């Protein structure tokens, strides 16, 4: 796989935006496939997240007492996690092929935004100047780690309105990681 420098990364990102714009002008697109049923790890993680979320609710920091597992956004975070699974490394420099996969996230986002407002996410770093990204949270249901994970999600201020969470737990080099995003129903 070819590694991209910053200029190639930005050029490819711009090209992806243009391609998405042009695709929106064409015929009907195929809707994303429905997400898979949650695993035991995902269910355990939601329970641990909700313990922390409840404390935030009691302190008046969030709108809803708990997050409901809703895997409608899992397809998007699974695309991201799949890049690491395919590369078999928790720190990865994005390639042209990876960027093509990431274009699929926009389809999910467009579909979700018809019903939901999107909040924060946690589990994957922002790209560095060299286009490197990393999985940032190894799977854990321990209070301290879950608190850090929730704090990352809450980094986006509107996440306080979240009702739902989608989770994906990629396994890379024998370690399980956690990726999540939160969202809530659009008000009419």
Question: What is each model feature region?
Answer:
Residues 99-188:
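A well-ordered secondary-structure block
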Residues 16, 80, 84, 153-157:
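Alpha-helix boundary/capping residues
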Residues 1-20:
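N-terminal secretory signal peptides and thylakoid transit peptides that target proteins
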Residues 32-109:
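Short, well-ordered surface patches within globular domains
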